[in-house]
Amino acid sequence: MTACTFFGHRDCPSSIKEKLYEEIEQLISHHGVDIFYIGTQGSFDRMTYAVLEDLRKRYLHIKIYRVLAYLPKPGDNDTADTIVPEGIENAYPRYAIVHRNNWMIDHSDYVIAYVTRTFGGAYQAVERAKKKGKIIIQTR
């Protein structure tokens, strides 16, 4: 099993959707990627999740997991495709997203990113993924 995760700025433009679609489909059809981990913050995550759901109609074997940065509250729509990383309950709220991002990097082979600035959480996550030897694909 080969996995991919995603990092991007909260305020990404919808114009990257086609590139995102192409890159994900390329990973599925040419590189055997069948597991996708995605966060739950911002427009990049929402757009990526929508693209993955659309691709799952054609590639029935792929698995899509939403990885939470915070423990779900009672009454949250807890679905089978949700992962809570081990140790997240001990992470300070300020660092919970970093903890979640590190988990996604550690469990992935590829990273698809939309990063246009040299600061912020998405930038830091991509830099960490590079240091860990992950294959980075930029969508800009």
In which residue ranges do the predicted regions lie?
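Acidic/glycine-enriched connector segments
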Residues: 1-140
